[in-house]
């Protein structure tokens, strides 16, 4: 187990999470007593207590007063905030994780972009106008892409869509920094944003879903062509 954390709390958090992931503390099991665990990890009980509370908030653990701390099945109890952690823990499954993330983005974006254009076209066009100021580099495009999807999600009038995109931000933007290092990816994205502008201005709401899904397929082709040269630890790219 290689742990890169600098602080005692960070070390303890990574130790426990990696132990859950690797089966040392499997889902459904009970964590060792606080004193034993603090000695095992090499941190104070106060530090350990703070870490356990944070992990419980993130869905890794269940803490009940007077009862032992239980390890959860994190797939069922955690939220989007653990995506970056999962990418760091299992490099071999990163491509699958990213494919699933992009599929979710495409499926929900097809819905919220149509709604945004229909109910809030002015705000939608303002969001899309950000493309006029983007610099031709991966960092700038990564943030632009995130900001456009996030902005249109909130423009839909349903803030839940925006919160979902917020939850994807960390891993999403790191993926973007690698993906948008490809000039073809940047060109495809600009073309997609322009298509959205036209659909919004023409009130062609029924064509939005097809446009978004086509972009998902075309960007997926580029993404898959880049996987063979993808860094082994994408979650750390340009951190």
Curated annotation (Swiss-Prot):
| DNA-binding span(s) | 34-53
**Which Gene3D superfamilies did the record assign?**
GntR ligand-binding domain-like (1.20.120.530), Winged helix-like DNA-binding domain superfamily/Winged helix DNA-binding domain (1.10.10.10)
Q: Which segments constitute the HTH gntR-type domain?
A: 6-74
What's a GO cellular component annotated to this UniProt protein?
A: cytoplasm
Q: Which UniProt keywords apply?
A: Activator, Cytoplasm, DNA-binding, Fatty acid metabolism, Lipid metabolism, Repressor, Transcription, Transcription regulation
Which BP terms in the Gene Ontology apply to this protein?
A: fatty acid metabolic process; regulation of fatty acid metabolic process
Subcellular location per the Swiss-Prot or TrEMBL entry = Cytoplasm
Q: Where is it mostly found? A: cytoplasm
Q: Which GO terms describe its molecular function?
A: DNA binding; DNA-binding transcription factor activity; fatty-acyl-CoA binding
Which Pfam families does the UniProt entry name for this protein?
A: FadR_C (PF07840), GntR (PF00392)
Q: Which SUPFAM superfamilies match?
A: GntR ligand-binding domain-like (SSF48008), Winged helix' DNA-binding domain (SSF46785)
Subunit and partners: Homodimer.
The function of this protein is:
Multifunctional regulator of fatty acid metabolism.
PANTHER family in the record: FATTY ACID METABOLISM REGULATOR PROTEIN (PTHR43537:SF52), TRANSCRIPTIONAL REGULATOR, GNTR FAMILY (PTHR43537)
Protein's name according to its UniProt entry: Fatty acid metabolism regulator protein
Q: Which organism is it from?
A: Photorhabdus laumondii subsp. laumondii (strain DSM 15139 / CIP 105565 / TT01)
Q: What is the lineage of its organism?
A: Bacteria, Pseudomonadati, Pseudomonadota, Gammaproteobacteria, Enterobacterales
């Amino acid at each position: 187990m290689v742990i890169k954390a600098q602080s005692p709390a960070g070390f303890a958090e990574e130790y426990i999470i990696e132990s859950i992931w690797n089966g040392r503390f499997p889902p459904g099991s009970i964590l060792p007593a606080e004193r034993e665990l603090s000695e095992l990890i090499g941190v104070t009980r106060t530090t350990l207590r703070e870490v356990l509370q944070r992990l419980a908030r993130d869905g890794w653990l269940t803490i009940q007063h007077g009862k032992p701390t239980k390890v959860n099945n994190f797939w069922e109890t955690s939220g989007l905030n653990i995506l970056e952690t999962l990418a760091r823990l299992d490099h071999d499954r990163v491509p699958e994780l990213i494919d699933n993330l992009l599929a979710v983005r495409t499926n929900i974006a097809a819905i919220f972009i149509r709604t945004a254009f229909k109910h809030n076209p002015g705000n939608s066009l303002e969001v899309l106008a950000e493309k006029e100021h983007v610099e031709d580099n991966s960092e700038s495009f990564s943030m632009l892409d995130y900001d456009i999807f996030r902005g249109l999600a909130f423009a839909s009038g349903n803030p839940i869509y925006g919160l979902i995109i917020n939850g994807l931000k960390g891993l999403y933007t790191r993926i973007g920094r690698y993906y948008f290092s490809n000039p073809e990816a940047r060109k495809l994205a600009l073309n997609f944003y322009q298509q959205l502008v036209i659909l919004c201005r023409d009130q062609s709401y029924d064509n939005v879903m097809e446009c978004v899904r086509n972009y998902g397929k075309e960007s997926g082709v580029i993404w898959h062509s880049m996987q063979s040269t993808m860094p082994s630890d994408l979650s750390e790219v340009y951190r």
